[in-house]
Amino acid sequence: MPTINQLIRKERKKVIRKTKSPALLECPQRRGVCTRVYTTTPKKPNSALRKVAKVKLTSKVEVISYIPGEGHNLQEHSIVLVRGGRVKDLPGVKYHIIRGALDTAGVAKRNVSRSKYGAKKAKAGGDKK
């Protein structure tokens, strides 16, 4: 605990919090345009072809963002909504594309966790045996 004299000589240091998604500029989401849609491979020990897109945001920053879910309709010049959230096994990917918003279609035939993938509720009675 500092004394009054110590505080007069040198004031308390402000805590500077570093954001994990700086390109969003403190916003929850940002709109952007896809400049390149491609697949990439994850770090060891995982193996897959992860779908990612390079997106130019309205904040004039170009970021690499992950396309979640099975299958997508994105191509160059698609307008997308980007949120924060990294992908642990893809270095440099710190953003996610929101499915079901703007030009991005929701995941087809998705029954669980639908809200995360922009999927509409299936018609009742269509899944009976």
UniProtKB/Swiss-Prot annotation:
Keywords: Methylation, Ribonucleoprotein, Ribosomal protein, RNA-binding, rRNA-binding, tRNA-binding. The keyword Ribonucleoprotein applies. Pfam families: Ribosom_S12_S23. PROSITE patterns: RIBOSOMAL_S12. GO terms for cellular component: small ribosomal subunit. InterPro entries: NA-bd_OB-fold, Ribosomal_uS12, Ribosomal_uS12_bac. CDD domains: Ribosomal_S12. The keyword tRNA-binding applies. GO terms for biological process: translation. The modification 3-methylthioaspartic acid is found at residue 89. One of its GO terms (molecular function) is rRNA binding. Gene3D superfamilies: Nucleic acid-binding proteins. Belongs to the universal ribosomal protein uS12 family. HAMAP family: Ribosomal_uS12_B. Part of the 30S ribosomal subunit. Contacts proteins S8 and S17. May interact with IF1 in the 30S initiation complex. With S4 and S5 plays an important role in translational accuracy. Interacts with and stabilizes bases of the 16S rRNA that are involved in tRNA selection in the A site and with the mRNA backbone. Located at the interface of the 30S and 50S subunits, it traverses the body of the 30S subunit contacting proteins on the other side and probably holding the rRNA structure together. The combined cluster of proteins S8, S12 and S17 appears to hold together the shoulder and platform of the 30S subunit. This is Small ribosomal subunit protein uS12.
